[in-house]
Design a protein with these regions (language model features):
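Single conserved hydrophobic/aromatic residue that forms the stacking wall/gate
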Residues: 1-12
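Extended, compositionally biased non-globular segments
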Residues: 10-133, 137
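Exposed low-complexity, polar/acidic, P/S/T/G-rich flexible segments that act as propeptides
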Residues: 139-155
Length: 155
């Protein structure tokens, strides 16, 4: 049944012709929501612009929901939209990163210019304004309907 399949190319079998035409109008070849979603964050939970002069915690109660064969990543970009140079050459955190889950299965990522003293997983941000892009390929249906990315809390 092509309405539930998630294989590569299945988007062309779906019946959402109007939606697919609108996507093609803006960016031919762009992924539809069934294939990928791209949440972006520019502000913390206090509605302040993200700035590497501060330290933040990105807390996932549960890992981003993707289907088998899918993956997720979070990448930090400077306000110039380029990757941020850093001493450990780490530019993103993904489902394939070597992070350590909390006892309850949640994940905490420290966003800051300097390595955290508590040993938590660190995504370097530089010491200027930055933003985050999350990519979820083959997101689980609940991601499309109910899941909200976590807020970013200043420490």
């Amino acid at each position: 049944d092509s309405s539930t399949s998630r294989g590569l190319g299945d988007v062309y079998k779906r019946q959402a012709y109007d939606y697919r035409a609108a996507v093609a109008l803006v960016g031919l070849g762009a992924n539809t929501n069934e294939i990928a979603i791209y949440p972006r964050a520019d502000y913390d939970s206090n509605n302040e612009v993200l700035n590497g002069a501060n330290s933040y915690t990105l807390h996932f109660s549960s890992l981003p929901p993707v289907e088998e064969g899918g993956f997720w990543s979070i990448t930090a970009y400077g306000d110039d939209n380029y990757l941020i140079d850093n001493p450990i050459n780490r530019y993103n955190v993904t489902d394939r990163s070597e992070y350590k889950l909390n006892v309850d299965g949640s994940l905490d990522v420290t966003l800051s210019a300097n390595a955290p003293q508590d040993g938590s997983y660190w995504l370097p941000t530089g010491n200027k304004a930055f933003h985050l892009f999350m990519r979820m390929y083959l997101p689980d249906l609940k991601a499309l309907d109910n899941w909200t990315p976590p807020t970013i809390t200043k420490k």
